């Protein structure tokens, strides 16, 4: 392995006094409505050249720090939404800012490799530190991609390639397959399907939308593959008071999975893979039990179906484990685990049996982005050094307790408080009341967000501590009273 | 608009003496076989954690500069392949290295926005300088995405959304559409298709593979949408000696387009969009004439079909125009133009009629990467300042002339020399001979690459000058003689 070029401490020193914020405020400070006049003016400018329909407010990223996002008007909000759960260490973490000064990051940025063909000399080293060191149990091989959607797309392609190879007795494509695929005829272009679940979200490409059932606005007007969708458990909370009901949910859903595998087989459209989130996040924070997922593992093993766990939103530590599926105690590991968001780079881990033997089948120009891998390498180091997963577990336990208490005192406005670690949600009676609550919370200095039809979700980063928790619940309480 | 934070000249000064190369060698220097012993050792390391089937050699990106790529073993090659045509200004361009020092780039890197909801204060400014300033005639609105594939996917989604709105008299989705799409039933999930062309390459997601016909290994074992593929012209060269033959190609291909539009309409699977490359690059550098593309524009206008030009490989100036479709002189602009690679960020320009009115329909967490936009802003400034498109046109004219002469003197080894600007190709009698030539050229210090079944392609960056051209043809001549 070649040595890394030394960091220049002079660069860091200069950077340290630059215009990037380097400390958290002691609390939120709000001086305008949100969006304020500057955010509104920027949105008008932006609308001339780019869609703005989903823009909430513009952010001053130079002034944001830690758990606090600062908007264009100088309002500082405690952020428990963190760019849709995609910041592992909050804003402008000093260790990441330092990495940004290093020559190997700069060259990664300005001389971007086609890494499937011409990787950087430090690529394997980066993969080992950033990803192999946090690999899910049983899955050492990894492939980087640019985002969660491309991770899922390529995981599914890998599953199809494996499934077809199994049909050929383990062999690669023969002349007949290679010829027929150019006309999209069998056997080269097979009928194969992927099973998703009601409420699932796996991305917005046409393939991923075919297994996504989060919201109509995500899917309407877009053609889709005719792939099976099975039921996903809908538990009642608290769990310990609804054991029988919830167990029946698991059984019904697993029976539905089995039935649809058979149905699609009869329709000559075999299920090659099942893709599932540990917690259906965009769809409304719906949880599955370890027993449910163990059932899925057993069914997929029995039928020779690739079992893909989509940890794009759950991976990275906020659930109190680096992977949300860690606590399932499966009899054997999932075949693939996909990731993105908090892990900065997209990608997937896979079992060695799925490694594609032929070149250029899982391939594209960039196959990820080495700048993200270098940042992740440092982020993982910080997460381990500072015990941030343990912190999420501890602060998360307190979060769950407090959320339950808030619900109990809400006079029926809140329901179904649930979560793992700091990854948490609670339901409102309606979507409109939830939306009103989010707006009011933002104006009170707490940046939270919705998911599903009427859920409020919490997605703080890993630098969220007890002090931020206390402030969060003060602001939630205040907002609830003002609703 | 808020002012950008000032650059620190001290940072730049420090950076200038760092370990990043800042000058080109006078010519190639080769001291080992390629891949050499260090590249081979790195590949072995990499293979433990990541697929390596397509890896040619490892690159020392800190030592690479301008038109020269330096491999792990210290070999310096003149690079006319440039990371599969994705470097606009070669390696480690000093102006881009400077941008990497700026606080707004660093915060973009370490505090990445969910830019559809919380954009940076300088986002509209960056869009205007980086993209609007080079917008294709008639298309001012733009959407950034992460890569060429996601650009094409979202362009196609936009086309579907528009096509369905037209069917509803310009209206958004109603309750029936919203409800039915969750079960993937009509009318919410329509039967709609996209037309591609024989030899096309638009990316490797399942949707894009359905309109891709580059090579069997890209498509085999992957399920696909049943979408129409029309014939694409296959011209004979030189063009001025094959006018009648080539004109007939255009006519036959356009008739095929018309016939397949009708056929898919009869099958209740309307063609909502046609996607086409100006030059089919991965498929083997196949060109269409201005008359062919004018015919496509006329047909799509007549049928109310969205006309998408995929400039992922051609966009950015190497053809002697910023957009390869600039010289078609269409009666009206394309409806959409997609881009990536040399433009550093993915994305697409679109006509205002295609702007999606409802929020969260064209959306995802990141929707691009602001670091790439900031780099592109500087790259566009350099391209204009240094007259690099004009340079590509001039050097390109000489390149075409010399390639024709090389072919004439090749004793039948080369055929079909063709190109625009420095974007050029030539054919070998077989794929195996082409592959042998590429290997030998690399060992002689010229990094070129293949495309299609038996073509050699040239993809220098925009900093390629007459001096590099002379060296290129010396090396081509030497390699051809050694073949």
From Swiss-Prot, chains A, B:
Main location: mitochondrion
Binding site for pyridoxal 5'-phosphate: 148-149, 365
Keywords attached to this entry: Aminotransferase, Mitochondrion, Neurotransmitter degradation, Pyridoxal phosphate, Transferase, Transit peptide
Subcellular location: Mitochondrion matrix
Residues bearing PTM N6-(pyridoxal phosphate)lysine: 341
Alphabetical list of InterPro entries matching this protein: 4NH2But_aminotransferase_euk, Aminotrans_3, Aminotrans_3_PPA_site, PyrdxlP-dep_Trfase, PyrdxlP-dep_Trfase_major, PyrdxlP-dep_Trfase_small
Pfam families: Aminotran_3 (PF00202)
Gene Ontology cellular component annotations, sorted alphabetically: mitochondrial matrix; mitochondrion
GO biological process per UniProt: gamma-aminobutyric acid catabolic process
Cofactor: pyridoxal 5'-phosphate
Main enzyme class: transferase
Binding site for substrate: 204
Regions that span the bilayer: none
GO molecular function ontology, one term from the record: (S)-3-amino-2-methylpropionate transaminase activity
Catalytic activity: 4-aminobutanoate + 2-oxoglutarate = succinate semialdehyde + L-glutamate; (S)-3-amino-2-methylpropanoate + 2-oxoglutarate = 2-methyl-3-oxopropanoate + L-glutamate
UniProt keyword Transit peptide present: yes
EC number: 2.6.1.19, 2.6.1.22
Matching NCBIfam families: GABAtrns_euk
Recorded family membership: Belongs to the class-III pyridoxal-phosphate-dependent aminotransferase family.
Quaternary structure and interacting proteins, as annotated: Homodimer.
Listed name of the protein: Probable 4-aminobutyrate aminotransferase, mitochondrial
């Amino acid at each position: 392995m070649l040595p890394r070029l030394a960091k220049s401490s002079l660069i860091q020193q200069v950077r340290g006094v630059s215009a990037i914020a380097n400390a958290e405020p002691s609390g939120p400070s709000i001086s305008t409505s949100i969006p304020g006049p500057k955010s509104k003016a920027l949105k008008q400018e932006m609308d001339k050249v780019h869609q703005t329909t989903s823009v909430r407010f513009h952010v001053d990223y130079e002034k944001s720090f830690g758990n606090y996002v600062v908007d264009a008007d100088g309002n500082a909000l405690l952020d428990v939404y963190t760019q849709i759960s995609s910041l592992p260490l909050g804003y402008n973490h000093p260790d990441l800012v330092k990495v940004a000064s290093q020559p190997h990051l700069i060259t990664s940025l300005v001389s971007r490799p086609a890494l499937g063909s011409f990787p950087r000399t430090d690529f394997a080293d980066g993969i080992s530190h950033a990803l192999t060191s946090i690999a899910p149990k049983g899955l050492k091989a990894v492939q980087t991609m640019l985002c969660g959607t491309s991770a899922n797309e390529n995981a599914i392609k890998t599953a199809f390639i494996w499934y077809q190879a199994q049909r050929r007795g383990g062999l690669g494509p023969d002349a007949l397959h290679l010829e027929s695929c150019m006309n999209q005829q069998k056997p080269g272009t097979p009928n194969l399907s992927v099973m998703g679940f009601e409420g699932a979200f796996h991305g917005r490409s046409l393939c991923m939308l075919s297994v996504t059932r989060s919201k109509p606005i995500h899917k309407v007007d877009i053609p889709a593959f005719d792939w099976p969708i099975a039921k996903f458990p809908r538990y009642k909370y608290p769990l310990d008071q609804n054991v029988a009901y919830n167990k029946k949910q698991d059984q019904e859903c697993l029976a539905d999975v089995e039935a649809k595998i058979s149905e699609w087989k009869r329709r000559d459209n075999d299920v090659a893979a099942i893709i599932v989130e540990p917690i259906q996040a965009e769809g409304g924070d719906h949880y599955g039990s370890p027993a449910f997922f163990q059932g899925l593992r057993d069914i997929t093993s029995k039928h020779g179906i690739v079992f893909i766990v989509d940890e794009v939103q759950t991976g990275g530590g906020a659930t109190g484990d680096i992977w949300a599926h860690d606590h399932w105690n499966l009899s054997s590991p999932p075949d693939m685990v996909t990731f993105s968001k908090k892990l900065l780079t997209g990608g997937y881990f896979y079992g060695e049996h799925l490694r594609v033997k032929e070149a250029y089948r899982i391939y594209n120009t960039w196959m990820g982005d080495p700048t993200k891998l270098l940042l992740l390498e440092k982020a993982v180091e910080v997460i381990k050094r500072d015990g941030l997963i343990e912190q999420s577990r501890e602060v998360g336990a307190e979060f769950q307790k407090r959320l339950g208490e808030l619900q109990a005192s809400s006079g029926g406005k809140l329901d179904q408080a649930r979560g793992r670690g700091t990854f948490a949600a609670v339901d409102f009676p309606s979507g409109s009341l939830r939306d009103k609550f989010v707006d009011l919370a933002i104006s009170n200095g707490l940046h939270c967000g919705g998911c599903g039809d009427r859920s409020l979700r919490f997605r703080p980063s890993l630098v969220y501590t007890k002090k931020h928790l206390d402030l969060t619940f003060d602001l939630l309480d205040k907002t609830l009273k003002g609703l």
